[in-house]
Structures are given as C-alpha cells and as structure tokens.
Amino acid sequence: MRQPRLFRLRGPAPLRGARDRGASAVEFAGILPLLLLVAMAAIQLGLVGYAVQQAGTGARAAARTASHQETEGLYAARGRAAMSDWTGRRARFALSAGGEEVRVTTTVTIPSVIPGLGSLGEASRSATMPRD
C-alpha cells in the first residue's frame, strides 16, 4: 500500500526577488529630484529669513548714525558696514527725517538659489531713532 505524500518533492525553489535586483536604485533615482527640490526650498527659505534679519540690522545701524547731527550723512555707509558683505551690496537705504525723529528704511534684494531666476523680491525693514 502506498503512503500518501505529505510533501511534494520538487527541485530547488526559485529564488524570490531575483528580478527585483536594482529596484531600490531605481526608486532612489526617482525620489532624488524631489529630495533636491525640498532641500533647495529649505535653503531658499533660510536666505529669505537672513535677508530680512540683515535688513533690520542695517536699518537700525543707519538710523542710529543718522540721529547724530555730525554723522548724519554717513548713515548708508554705516548701515552697510553693519550688514554682511553680500547683503550690504544688495541694500538700499532711504532716510526720512522728521522734527525729533529719524527714520531709515533698508531694502535688500532677496537672491534666488536657482541660477538664472534673478531675485525673489525684496525685504524691507525700518528703524526710527530720536535725534540727538
């Protein structure tokens, strides 16, 4: 009498995943542009924040200088000196003097991290100081 086979005998089992070789490299190549885009957006956001902060620093230094009678004409140079080099080169200063106050508005052009795009607008900050 023949005994029932519990297991079927076959040759070696085919290798599972043999056709999946290199799939992770293809997936990585597909996601890489998205990762680069997110990284560039984060860097651009940091540049915007830095430009705004530098505009405020330049405005305060320029207003402080313009508030003194003897150094009033040097306000733009002192404002640029308080800023980093690359933001100082992109900065414009506007002075509006009232009776007892001096107000300086600094405008900085925000650069783009994408080559050839130009600028992404401007960041402006103002500072008011009492006259001495």
Question: Whereabouts are the PLM-identified features?
Answer:
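Alpha-helical assembly-interface signal, strongest on the long, hydrophobic N-terminal helix that forms
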Residues: 1-75
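Short, conserved structural patches
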Residues: 2-9, 68, 72-132
